């Protein structure tokens, strides 16, 4: 999370800046499992197809969120090998800063996140798990939970606590993800579960906390967090 106001007021503005080049400045990764474009024809009993995991500030923007999101969706962050843990494979969206420094300039707040592919993915999903990073002074060593999908949010809290991970439902309006315009709340049920994880808490998930090596050095703490998130999504 940047210290000051965003450089760009929207993703449209970010993409319009010729200084930003896909594959150099930023990257986009997403996966959508097969479903009908017609909402009424989408299956209602397949939690995998119905759920999307997002890291809208991935890569170097809010470091570590890409890796968490991929693993929570069921794909190993280093190899993209699908999980066989029995908790399914989910759709995902990642927008990743690729700069060696200054990735905070690519942060567009969730309520101004008018990315067309991401919007389509969310609007055609029933549930959303959204991963964010915040400052240590905001999190105080405790994962901050929010979003308008209170059922999933509360299940995430329960599973995190069962895994021995400190978490709480935040009352900070900068972190609570409760704006209806938050892209992650634009699901078919009008809500998401949002996690805000402090800088140091994200750093502790990896043996080597650099963009090239995070995916290769995930540790027990990382997989404990991911396991709790995957169990949570299987319960809704």
Segments and roles (model prediction):
Residues 1-236:
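N-terminal catalytic or cofactor-binding beta/alpha core of small enzyme domains
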């Amino acid at each position: 999370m940047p210290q000051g106001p965003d450089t760009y007021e929207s993703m449209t503005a970010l993409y319009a800046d010729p200084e930003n080049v896909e594959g150099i400045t930023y990257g986009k990764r997403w996966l959508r499992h097969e479903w009908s474009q017609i909402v009424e024809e989408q299956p209602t009993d397949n939690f995998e197809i119905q759920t999307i995991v997002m890291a809208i500030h991935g890569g170097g923007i809010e470091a570590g969120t890409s890796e968490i999101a991929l693993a929570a969706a069921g794909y190993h962050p280093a190899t993209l090998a699908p999980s066989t843990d029995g908790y399914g494979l989910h759709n995902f969206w990642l927008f990743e800063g690729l700069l060696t420094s200054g990735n905070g300039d690519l942060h567009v707040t969730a309520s101004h996140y008018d990315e067309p592919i991401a919007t389509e993915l969310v609007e055609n999903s029933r549930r959303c798990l959204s991963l964010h990073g915040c400052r240590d002074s905001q999190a105080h060593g405790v994962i901050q939970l929010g979003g308008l999908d209170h059922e999933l949010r509360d299940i995430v809290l329960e599973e995190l606590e069962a895994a021995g991970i400190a978490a709480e439902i935040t009352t900070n309006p900068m972190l609570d993800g409760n704006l209806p315009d938050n892209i992650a709340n634009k699901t078919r049920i009008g809500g998401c579960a949002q996690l805000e994880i402090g800088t140091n808490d994200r750093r502790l998930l990896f043996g080597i906390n650099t963009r090239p090596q995070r995916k290769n050095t995930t540790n027990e703490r990382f997989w404990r967090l991911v396991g709790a998130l995957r169990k949570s999504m299987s319960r809704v």
